[in-house]
UniProtKB/Swiss-Prot annotation:
Biological role stated in the UniProt entry: Binds to the 23S rRNA.
Taxonomic path: Archaea, Methanobacteriati, Methanobacteriota, Stenosarchaea group, Methanomicrobia
Cofactor names: Zn(2+)
Entry's Gene Ontology cellular component terms: cytosolic large ribosomal subunit
Similarity comment text for this entry: Belongs to the eukaryotic ribosomal protein eL37 family.
Protein name: Large ribosomal subunit protein eL37
PROSITE patterns hit by this protein: RIBOSOMAL_L37E
UniProt keywords, alphabetically: Metal-binding, Ribonucleoprotein, Ribosomal protein, RNA-binding, rRNA-binding, Zinc, Zinc-finger
UniProt binding sites for Zn(2+): 19, 22, 34, 37
Length: 56
């Protein structure tokens, strides 16, 4: 039940792969969803207003 250095050696599986839609390496293999574009979760491209800087 250790959570330190000895358990870090067991982390060797791939969590994210290359996305089919956006091409970035942010497609979660376990949940089958892309965290960058939202592929697998929604048909629209994932985009938020807070991603762009404000133009003052």
């Amino acid at each position: 039940m250790s959570k330190g250095t000895s358990s870090m050696g067991k982390r060797q599986k791939r969590t994210h792969a290359k996305c089919r839609r956006c091409g970035s390496v942010s497609f979660n293999v376990h949940t089958k969803q892309c965290t960058s574009c939202g592929f697998g979760k929604t048909s629209r491209i994932r985009a938020y207003k807070w991603q762009a800087k404000c133009k003052y």
